[in-house]
């Protein structure tokens, strides 16, 4: 049975981990055992935060819509309820963008929401 030299595979694996740990501070960037743990933890944070990002953006959009709706005497929940009763289907991302950058268009949505609430 021939002799197996394992240097190539081990070096490739170490290189992959150490390249992923570029930019880390201290021994995390150049000691394989520590870098491996740091890279694994970074992966866990990345996985978790990809899901949290969606929640955080939705919360931001809701806060912006709420602030915009209150300028027209509506709360967020009444504003959304009014739009639903008016059969307006605009997502929160677009509404938040309008609330910040296009006040006139948002005002029209606020009027639609008020008319939807009054009709019901």
Swiss-Prot record:
CDD domains the UniProt entry points to: Ribosomal_L20
Record carries keyword Ribonucleoprotein: yes
Superkingdom of source: Bacteria
Protein name: Large ribosomal subunit protein bL20
Keyword Plastid recorded: no
Family of the protein in this entry: Belongs to the bacterial ribosomal protein bL20 family.
InterPro entries membership: Ribosomal_bL20, RIBOSOMAL_L20_CS, Ribosomal_protein_bL20_C
PANTHER family tied to this protein: 39S RIBOSOMAL PROTEIN L20
NCBIfam families referenced in this protein's UniProt entry, alphabetically: rplT_bact (TIGR01032)
Classification via Gene3D superfamilies: 6.10.160.10, Ribosomal protein L20
Any single GO CC term annotated in Swiss-Prot or TrEMBL for this entry: ribonucleoprotein complex
Record GO terms (molecular function): rRNA binding; structural constituent of ribosome
């Amino acid at each position: 049975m021939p002799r197996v030299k394992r240097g190539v595979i081990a070096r490739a694996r170490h290189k992959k981990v150490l390249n992923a740990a570029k930019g880390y501070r201290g021994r995390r960037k150049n000691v394989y055992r520590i870098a491996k743990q740091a890279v694994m933890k970074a992966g866990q944070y990345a996985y978790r935060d990809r899901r949290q990002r969606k929640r955080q953006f939705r919360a931001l959009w809701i806060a912006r819509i709420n602030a915009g709706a209150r300028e027209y005497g509506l709360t967020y929940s009444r504003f959304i309820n009014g739009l639903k009763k008016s059969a307006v289907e605009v997502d929160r991302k677009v509404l938040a963008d309008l609330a910040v950058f296009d006040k006139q268009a948002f005002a029209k949505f606020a009027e639609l929401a008020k008319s939807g609430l009054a009709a019901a």
